[in-house]
Structure formats: C-alpha cells, structure tokens
Design a protein with these regions (language model features):
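Conserved C-terminal RecA-like helicase domain
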Residues: 174-333
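Conserved ATPase-coupling elements of RecA-like P-loop NTPase cores
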Residues: 25-30, 56-67, 90, 344-347
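SF2 helicase catalytic motif II
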Residues: 38-78
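Interdomain helical connector at the RecA1-RecA2 junction of SF1/SF2 helicase-like NTPases
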Residues: 90-213, 229-245
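A short beta-strand element within the Helicase C-terminal
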Residues: 333-336, 340-365, 380-384
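Structural recognition of the conserved hydrophobic beta-strand(s) that form the central parallel beta-sheet
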Residues: 15-18, 76-81, 335-336
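Inter-Walker segment of RecA-like/P-loop motor cores
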Residues: 1-32
C-alpha cells in the first residue's frame, strides 16, 4: 500500500484498501520519522487525495480520521452509509471528536432512504414479531420484589405497590428486567421451542417438499450465549425423532411436512475481535464446534484459519456459488453476535431471530440482512425474544429515523 501511494505512476488512480491496512502503513511511517527523521509521505503532503469510505457510520472513527488527516492534510472525504449516526443516536462524547456522521463528514450530498428503496422494489419490507418469554405475572412479581426493598417505597402498602405496578407503562416495566434473566437455560429453551415449533419453522425457513429453502440468523448478546444456543440445539436435535418428541402437542398442519433429517444445519461465526475476551476458553470450545462442522461438511478448517472457516460459513449461508446451491451443502441457521449483521448480502436469508437489544443503526443494519429480493420471498421476517414492548419502540424509533 505504501509503495502504491508513493508511486509516480499512480497519479489519478483509485486504490481500494482497508482502514486497518492504511493505519498500519501510517504507523510504519510514524516509526520511520521517529527513528530516522524520515518523512515517508512527505511528497503527498501537498497533493489532493480523496478518501471514499463505505459503511462510514462505523468503518472509521472520528479519532482515526483525524490521525489520517495529519498525514494527508489536503484530503477530501466522502462517506456512504445506509444508517448515518444522527443526533438521536449520537456516539458518546470523547473530547471534541465528532459524534454524528454529519459532524465527521459534513453536509449530506444525497439521500436514498428505506422508503425510496421500497418504492423502487429494490428491497422487501419487514414483518416483525415480538415474542415474550416472561409471563406477565412473573414480571409483576419481579417488579414487586424490587420495589418492596426500595427505601423510596417503604411507606407504600402491598396494595399501593401493586396499584403502581398495574399503572406502569409496559416499557417501564421492562426496565426492571436484568440481562441475567435472559441468560437462564429456561429462556434459551423457550426461544428454541418458538423457533423450531413445526408450523413456525415451516414458514421461517420456507419449507417445500419437506426441505428448507431459506436460511436464518440468530443474533445473541455474547459469544457465551451463542455457544450455549449451539449446544442446546445440538442436544435438542440429536434424536432423529426430535420434532415428534419436542413438539408432540404442536403437530404440523396437514399438507406441510418437515422431512429433512439433517435440519437444522447450524454454525457459529464470530470475528477475532469479538473473541478477545476470555480468548483461551472460547478457542477451546470453538475447536470442538469447528470439528463438528468439518465432520458434517467434509472440510478441514481449524482455529488457526478461523477466517477461512468464517468464509466457508458465508458461502454456505449465501448459496451464491454453484457448489453451495446443492441441497445439503447449505447452512440453515447461523448463530452470531455482531458478525454478518452489517454489509453481508445473502438473498436466501429470510429470517432474523433477535435475542438481544438492538436500536437505531444497529437495528436497521441487522434487520436488513433479511430484506434482499429473492424468488418466492415477500418479506424479511424478524422475531425478537427480549423486552417485546421496548423492542417494539426501538423498531418504531429506528424506522422513523431512517425512513
């Protein structure tokens, strides 16, 4: 990259690179300046360089941009994004650094919103369902216990506290729910039984002639939760007659069949950055997960080539290449934390299952994995499993902001 930037033959040339590679080149140049007093990019100081940044709402922080501008002071910046950061969802303050996309890149030159894309039939609309795994009585009891030990309500009678709970808006009630409540095995089992209930799975994975034709993503709050879901699904489906056993009271409707013995084919994918916390333990478990993956698909990936493993998952999920269009080569459900939720294009993804909190840009980006047009696909299907009233509000807020 450094040679390309400094080459005399590269005038009026477009160079495509990554933020990481550019930053690495600049760090190397800085070390040369400190050690040898050599200005490696001195010849570029007066040149007009244009930077075009894709996914600019997240690809380059304001701090990183300022550092790059120190090397290229005569630069012009353009940003492309489907989800700019606005005042409503601006980033946390960090000195005088920009907190919105407007602050970082300047005035917008053009807009093409979700509404425009829908009007042009370039994308599909969303059908959103908000599932609740916590019964209302349990939630009210949980809130009651919290208020009863709060000094602010020490003078309230039992009836007084109950009356106050009855008058609480649903979103306010959900503020009393700790994340740990959704990390219980009971919650995981309820989610899985909602996902794989035969009538539901038939629609969400678009079964035809007993086989799934579309894929889904399950996004969770952490790598630990992702792996717990993986193991729970493996345990639930290890018996060939698991559907009949688990859903004896939810028979599939007449005319609908689920006859694929390997359904659901599942995988976990994550970025190395996501895996930095508790890395040793995470990698130990991932070795076993990758071993299972290799055994099924006949691959030979390892923890040392995690990027190639992730790439293989991408291909099997997207089903764009001929070798992955053959039935049985695909993945039905991929479990992620953040990976694949931005910029990944796979029209065969029909459903996003959400077991975490999402809002604004992250919500729209994640939902948009499902809205690519594809034969016999009419909507992007979204199912959320945490704080249904809060998520309903988040969806409304994000849709209003980005439409």
């Amino acid at each position: 990259l450094s040679r390309a930037l400094l080459s005399d033959t590269n005038n009026n040339t477009v160079i495509i690179t990554t933020r990481q590679k550019l930053e690495s080149a600049l760090r190397h140049a800085q070390k040369q300046k400190e050690k040898r007093n050599v200005e490696r990019f001195k010849k570029l100081l007066g040149q007009h360089i244009v930077f075009v940044v894709d996914e600019c709402h997240r690809a380059l922080s304001a701090e990183n941009m300022d550092e790059i501008k120190q090397f290229f002071p005569n630069s012009t910046w353009f940003g492309f994004t489907g989800t700019p950061i606005f005042e409503e969802n601006k980033k946390q303050a960090k000195g005088q650094l920009a907190r919105t996309t407007h602050d970082q890149y300047g005035e917008k030159l053009h807009t093409y919103t979700i509404k425009d894309a829908l009007d042009d039939a370039a994308v599909l609309g969303f059908q959103v369902e908000h599932e609740d795994t916590i019964e209302q009585t349990s939630l009210n009891n949980h809130i009651f216990k919290n208020l009863q030990v709060n000094e602010k309500y020490a003078s309230y009678s039992v009836d007084g506290i109950n009356d106050m709970i009855d008058q609480m808006p649903p979103v306010e009630k959900e503020e009393y729910l700790d994340a740990t409540i959704y990390e219980r095995d009971e919650h995981i089992q309820k989610v899985l039984h909602k996902i794989f209930r035969p009538d539901n799975a038939y629609m969400k994975f678009d079964f035809q002639n007993g086989r799934p034709r579309k894929s889904a993503i399950l996004t969770t709050s952490s790598i630990d939760m992702a792996k717990r879901y993986y193991h729970a699904i493996k345990e639930m489906t290890k018996d060939p007659s698991w559907i009949q056993r688990e859903f004896a009271h939810h028979p599939i409707r007449t005319g609908r069949t689920i006859e694929d013995p390997d359904f659901p084919r599942i995988a976990i994918t994550y970025s190395m950055q996501e895996n930095e916390v508790d890395s040793a333990q995470n990698q130990k478990e991932m070795k076993k997960i990758i071993k299972d993956y290799n055994a099924y698909y006949g691959t030979a990936w390892g923890i040392d080539d995690i990027d190639r493993y992730n790439g293989d998952i991408n291909n099997r999920l997207a089903r764009k290449k001929g070798e992955f269009k053959e039935f049985g080569k695909q993945i039905d459900l991929v479990i992620v934390v953040d990976r694949l939720l931005t910029g990944f294009d796979a029209p065969t993804i029909q459903t996003l299952f959400v077991d975490r909190n999402l809002s604004y840009a992250n919500l729209i980006q994640a939902f948009s994995r499902t809205n690519r047009t594809y034969p016999d696909k009419t909507k992007g299907l979204i199912v959320t499993f945490r704080k249904p009233h809060s998520m309903e509000k988040n969806v409304a807020d994000a849709t209003r902001l980005y439409s």
